[in-house]
């Protein structure tokens, strides 16, 4: 059985502002029209309006950190365009989300918001968002996540040498750094004029920050071309192995509150702020975990097998095993998990959370040799037989795994952002709203909405 890639459904609500079920919205909807044509898809004005309202609701009480409405609308529209392009690319790659998967995702979102699916429907209706539109938005976000996963699996690798180097760095400095950044984007193959314009803009933004006319998060919201601009450019806590080598030494020498840059990177000019730093927990302590050895049999649900058919099949298989049939032989004959079927369903040794919480709970609750009742996961219907358990020191193994994951995450962020730039640069985009309205296809401009720095805001925002 392949280990499921963790898709935290709560994070779907933060990827784009279009699907937040708890954001305020006007109940009356204007007559819908097209805001932008994106290849063979469109962004509707209602989508754009709803997304802008949701961003504003997230900044309630901090409205002075938002850019003017026309700039905010352009930023949000560009984000929606990127979502449309990713969904289109995923569709061309055969990435799909079934209705059943979508239903489970929405049920999880409802649960995380302390309600039922029916309650979520009512909340959406009160907020002026149709349930069909909400389903479409959630489907798009799952598709985007799967495209990103596919990209990572095909293009991102981390060598043992990279892990060794990072561990050496960690031994020298175990510090963690809370970072924020502002990106003034440049297109690939930027001309001298584009570079000069970008340099002028980033210098102007830095001046506003240095003079205290804008704090860093507000400047990021107003001027950054990064996908996390609307989050104030916050990059979260990172260790040195999660930071590009070109910036790692610089950040190590900074003090909290300092802003570095402008720095020229592959995507454009950057300003970096060290928000906070802290020492990581000292290593050396053993970490003991319980590992389990188990076998399983999987019956999938899909186009060729309904939920009821799959459940009936797994019930029959379990009855045979309880009646005396050998589990391994039955797994080789009947399991639909191609990865473990040849080994009689053997999954080897693994911690309880390796295959997801539902699977782990079943294994933890069994005695050695016992066979579970049929249970459902995203993969389908299972039965599992626990073979044994043991205590294992995984401190060193975990440390290497964590370092490998952080390096991979950093590489993915860099490469996927470049991929999005390429995707945007190749796209047919025609704006039909605001001061960018046109009737012709446009090549992607530099991601920045403004060619030069606008005038500073009239009032200094609250820090």
From Swiss-Prot:
Database matches in InterPro entries:
OMP_Chaperone_SurA (IPR050280), PPIase_dom_sf (IPR046357), PPIase_PpiC (IPR000297), PPIase_SurA (IPR023034), SurA_N (IPR015391), Trigger_fact/SurA_dom_sf (IPR027304)
Bias (Pro residues) occurs at: 453-463
GO CC terms: outer membrane-bounded periplasmic space
What reaction does this catalyse? [protein]-peptidylproline (omega=180) = [protein]-peptidylproline (omega=0)
Indicate the transmembrane segments per the record. Answer: none
Which PROSITE patterns has this protein been placed in? PPIC_PPIASE_2
* Record flagged with keyword Signal: yes
Where is this protein primarily located?
A: periplasm
* Protein name in UniProt: Chaperone SurA
Organism, as annotated: Xanthomonas oryzae pv. oryzae (strain MAFF 311018)
Query: What's the name of its gene?
Result: surA
